[in-house]
C-alpha cells in the first residue's frame, strides 16, 4: 500500500461526496452522541469567520434545533464563541458567519490580555518567545476559554479541523486540535465548500483565502503561503488523484514530520 492510500484510509476521506447526505449524516451522528451522553446539554464552537468554523457552527446549530424539537427540551443549546485577539481584521466576515449560523447564544471574549500576561510572565524568567510561538499561544488560549464554557454548561467542545489541515499538521498541538469531537475531519477543503454551498452560506465566507491569522508580524498570512502548497492540490491527493512528484513529496513530508501532533507517543 502506498503512503497516499494509507493516509486516505487513516483520515477517512471519500473521493466523491453527496453534500446533502454528508450534512444529514453529521447532524444525526451529533444528535445521537448527545442523546447517548445525557449529561451533555451544549455544543461549543469558536467562530472565526472562516470556512471551517462557519460550517461546524452551522452543523451544530442545526443539530441542536432538531434535538430540541424532538426531545422538547430547551436545555439543549449551541454556544458560539468569538475569541478575537485585540481588533479582528476580518471582523465583518465573523459577523456574517454569526448571522448565517444564527446561534442560540453568542459570547465575545478577547484573549489579548491573557496571551500578553503569559508572555510577560515568561519574559520575567528570561524567556523570550518568538512571534510564531506567541501565535500558538493564541490558539491554546482560545481552547482554554472554550473548555471553561463547556465546564459550566455541561458542554461539548466541537473542533473545526479538516482533513487537509490534518494531513499537513497545520494546527496547533493542544490548541485547535484539542477538542472533544470533530464534525469535518473527514472532509477536505473542497468538500467543506460543497457543504456550505448546499447550506446556502454567503459565498464570500467559503471563497475567501484561508488564514490562521496567528502571527502579529504577518497578519492574515494565507495558509497556502505558510504550507508552500495549494489546498486544491492537497484535496486532489486526499481524493486519491494523481499529483506531481514534487507536490506529493511536500504533502508526505509534512505528514511524516507532524505525526507527533496527531498522536501521543507513549514511551513507557
UniProtKB/Swiss-Prot annotation:
GO terms for molecular function: ATP binding; glutaminase activity; metal ion binding; NAD+ synthase (glutamine-hydrolyzing) activity; NAD+ synthase activity. Signal peptide: none annotated. It catalyses: deamido-NAD(+) + NH4(+) + ATP = AMP + diphosphate + NAD(+) + H(+). SUPFAM superfamilies: Adenine nucleotide alpha hydrolases-like. Its EC number is 6.3.1.5. ATP binds at residues 46-53, 160, 189, 211. Keywords: ATP-binding, Ligase, Magnesium, Metal-binding, NAD, Nucleotide-binding. Deamido-NAD(+) binds at residues 140, 173, 180, 260-261. Pfam families: NAD_synthase. Pathway: Cofactor biosynthesis; NAD(+) biosynthesis; NAD(+) from deamido-NAD(+) (ammonia route): step 1/1. GO terms for biological process: NAD biosynthetic process. Catalyzes the ATP-dependent amidation of deamido-NAD to form NAD. Uses ammonia as a nitrogen source. Homodimer. Belongs to the NAD synthetase family. This is NH(3)-dependent NAD(+) synthetase. It comes from Buchnera aphidicola subsp. Schizaphis graminum (strain Sg). The gene is nadE.
Amino acid at each position: 500500500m502506498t503512503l497516499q492510500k494509507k493516509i486516505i484510509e487513516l483520515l477517512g476521506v471519500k473521493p466523491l461526496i453527496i453534500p446533502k447526505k454528508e450534512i444529514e449524516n453529521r447532524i444525526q451522528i451529533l444528535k445521537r452522541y448527545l442523546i447517548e451522553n445525557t449529561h451533555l446539554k451544549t455544543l461549543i464552537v469558536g467562530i472565526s469567520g472562516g470556512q471551517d468554523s462557519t460550517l461546524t457552527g452551522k452543523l451544530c446549530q442545526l443539530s441542536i434545533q432538531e434535538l430540541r424539537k424532538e426531545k422538547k427540551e430547551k436545555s439543549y443549546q449551541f454556544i458560539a464563541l468569538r475569541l478575537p485577539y485585540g481588533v479582528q481584521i476580518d471582523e465583518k466576515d465573523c459577523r456574517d458567519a454569526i448571522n448565517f449560523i444564527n446561534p442560540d447564544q453568542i459570547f465575545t471574549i478577547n484573549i489579548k490580555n491573557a496571551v500578553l500576561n503569559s508572555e510577560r510572565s515568561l519574559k520575567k524568567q528570561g524567556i523570550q518567545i518568538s512571534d510564531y510561538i506567541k501565535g500558538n499561544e493564541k490558539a491554546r488560549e482560545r481552547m482554554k476559554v472554550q473548555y471553561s464554557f463547556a465546564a459550566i454548561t455541561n458542554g461539548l467542545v466541537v473542533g473545526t479541523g479538516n482533513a487537509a489541515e490534518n494531513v499537513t499538521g497545520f494546527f496547533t498541538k493542544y490548541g485547535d486540535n484539542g477538542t472533544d469531537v470533530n464534525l469535518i475531519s473527514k472532509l477536505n477543503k473542497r468538500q467543506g465548500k460543497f457543504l456550505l454551498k448546499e447550506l446556502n452560506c454567503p459565498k464570500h465566507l467559503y471563497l475567501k483565502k484561508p488564514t490562521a491569522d496567528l502571527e502579529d508580524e504577518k497578519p492574515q498570512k494565507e495558509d497556502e503561503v505558510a504550507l508552500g502548497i495549494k489546498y486544491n492540490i492537497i484535496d486532489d491527493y486526499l481524493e486519491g488523484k494523481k499529483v506531481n512528484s514534487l507536490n506529493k513529496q511536500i504533502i508526505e513530508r509534512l505528514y511524516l514530520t507532524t505525526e507527533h501532533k496527531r498522536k501521543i507517543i507513549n514511551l513507557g
